[in-house]
């Protein structure tokens, strides 16, 4: 398994880092950590998908992102000893991660100064995501944001089959798109009538990913 976050880490440093990482397995719907928990480790995903969620001021649960194999979460734990988890992360299906604890990472930084590039990459990625979200929120209509998030999730879950099952609720998609469930339902119903998707209980089947991608531009 390769992780984009660690792509620039020297091979010998990467081997050492993974040798001290601790393998963890999670059942479907098992919580990895809650928002506000002490943050002490980076989680590298090797199997399964994980939702990153927060509670809104109104008490609703908003899904901020979904991460899959080759991705990671909990990156901010490597930046500060005083940090706490900024969101709750839950396994969408059975999954596996490799935990890199901050103390182990600090020792590796001292031995391999080039590992500092990982921290720079973390900050750069967070800034990129925040910038994209801000631009979309101001300039991209809600219906297109819904289609873009559905396309991204379909690409994340895509296998060898022609159709792609996205096991997320409409509330999840609303959180990802920064809009209401009613808007998501309206947009998805329109797409179902066009034949690009099929709606099922707590999931969406993408039948025409190329067409969905074209409409999401």
Predicted regions mapped to residue ranges:
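Cyclic nucleotide-binding regulatory module and flanking cytosolic helices
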Residues: 1-28, 77-79, 111
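A conserved hydrophobic position in a structured secondary element of the catalytic/binding core
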Residues: 9, 45, 68, 92, ...
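Phosphate-/nucleic-acid-contacting segments
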Residues: 153-217
């Amino acid at each position: 398994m390769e992780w984009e976050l660690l792509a620039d880490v020297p091979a010998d440093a990467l081997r050492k880092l993974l040798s001290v990482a601790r393998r963890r397995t999670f059942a479907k719907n098992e919580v990895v950590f809650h928002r506000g928990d002490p943050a002490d480790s980076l989680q590298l995903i090797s199997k399964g998908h994980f939702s990153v969620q927060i509670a809104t001021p109104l008490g609703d649960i908003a899904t901020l992102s979904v991460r899959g194999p080759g991705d990671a979460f909990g990156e901010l734990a490597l930046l500060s000893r005083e940090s706490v988890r900024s969101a709750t992360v839950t396994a969408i299906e059975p999954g596996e991660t490799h935990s890199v604890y901050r103390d182990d990472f600090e020792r590796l930084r001292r031995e391999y100064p080039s590992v500092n590039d990982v921290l720079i990459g973390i900050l750069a990625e967070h800034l990129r995501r925040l910038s994209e979200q801000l631009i979309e929120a101001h300039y991209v209509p809600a219906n297109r944001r819904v289609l873009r998030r559905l396309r991204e999730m379909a690409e994340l879950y895509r296998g060898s089959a022609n159709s792609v099952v996205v096991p997320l609720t409409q509330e999840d998609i609303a959180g990802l798109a920064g809009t209401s469930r009613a808007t998501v339902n309206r947009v998805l119903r329109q797409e179902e009538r066009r034949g690009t998707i099929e709606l099922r209980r707590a999931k969406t089947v993408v039948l025409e990913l190329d067409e969905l991608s074209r409409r999401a531009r």
